[in-house]
Amino acid sequence: MKRALLITLLLAACTSGPPPPAALDTKNESCAWCRMAISEARFAGQVVATSEEPRFFDDIGCLAHFLAGKARTAGTVAYVADHRTRTWVRADAAVYTEVAALATPMGSHLIAHADAASRDADPDAKGGRPRTAADVFGSGSAPGDGQ
């Protein structure tokens, strides 16, 4: 019985797809890039990799700096928080807006949303300039699972 359970768990771990986002504790996490405390989840990002601790970021700009020039490896996924709902969204699939009038933790002025409907429902995104993942993260874009 124990052996069957162990085999099932191992198979599930191998075939479960990209790693899911980790829970963010804004009372205890600091940015992996600038080392500032992460106080506002709506601006946060993270990188999760198989067999590694998640890395959190206080601003999408910090996430972009961290990823610049890094090789995209299998089992690594970047996530950003939907600014309106605070749910995690794959960074390579998010809709970005640059809002010059909006103060973000490190001044990138970038916010992310799961889709255009979430962006359109967010008053903070009004008047902002649409951006793509390639605009934010460069031609390699944000890592998806192995991308």
Model-derived regions, located:
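Bacterial signal peptide processing site
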Residues: 15-17
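C-terminal motif of bacterial Sec signal peptides marking the signal peptidase cleavage site
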Residues: 10-13
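Post-signal-peptide N-terminal segment of Sec-exported extracytoplasmic proteins
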Residues: 27-65, 69
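Sec-dependent signal peptide recognition
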Residues: 2-8
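Mature extracytoplasmic domains of secretory-pathway proteins
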Residues: 56-89
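Short, flexible, mixed-charge glycine/proline-rich loop motifs
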Residues: 20-27
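Thiol/selenol-based redox catalytic cores and closely related redox-interacting motifs
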Residues: 76-147
